Amino acid sequence: MTRTPTTRMGLLEVRGRADVASKGARLLRAKREVLAGELWKLTREVLAGRARLDEVLRGAVKALGLARALEGEEALASVALTAAREVPLQVSVRRVWGVPTPSVAAPALIRAADERGSSPTSWGLAGTEAARRHEEALEVLLRIASRELHLARLGEEIQATSRRINALEQLVLPALTAESGRIEAALEERDREDVVRLKRFRARRPRREASARRP
């Protein structure tokens, strides 16, 4: 830290900087509390989403196994090729206390039987159910992915905010307090020296006046 001049203006400057640092730490703590609340809420959503994804995937795998047994591997592979498609994703960024957090959005992924690139009659009931369950699993997966991206970003920002709070409270504020104390002690010592000099001056003044009155 740059050494501040040992003056009353310097003391006011250091105290002002300490006040700003203290207010900054309080604001950062408030920010961290908001982010922590958002993190806790999002964590519960992600855990619930993962449980839902596990449930949906188990159903999808079971439905696919049944479709393979009833309709055959080749028939399923043929209709699956015609059902292939690209899924357009929209990635946007929103801010929570100034923290940019990504969000992923996709259109509805579960399609009707006649929207999978071939005649509905090409699909057996088991194959149709397997396709629907896998499309549902993809929808759930994308929702979780968006929330997990948000969760990771919030965690990073909370850590960064904690580091800034620690720097202010453990480094900046103690240094400013020490500097303020140094200047204040120096000014008090200077004031005491001025008082002593003034007393000496006043003590010598009568003697000088008496000497001046002598013939």
Swiss-Prot record:
Q: Which InterPro entries match?
A: V_ATPase_D
- The name of this protein is V-type ATP synthase subunit D
- Function field: Produces ATP from ADP in the presence of a proton gradient across the membrane.
**One of the GO biological process terms:** proton motive force-driven plasma membrane ATP synthesis
Q: Which domain of life is it from?
A: Bacteria
- Which family does the record assign? Belongs to the V-ATPase D subunit family.
Q: Which UniProt keywords apply?
A: ATP synthesis, Hydrogen ion transport, Ion transport, Transport
Molecular function terms from GO: ATP binding; proton-transporting ATP synthase activity, rotational mechanism; proton-transporting ATPase activity, rotational mechanism
Residues of the signal peptide = none
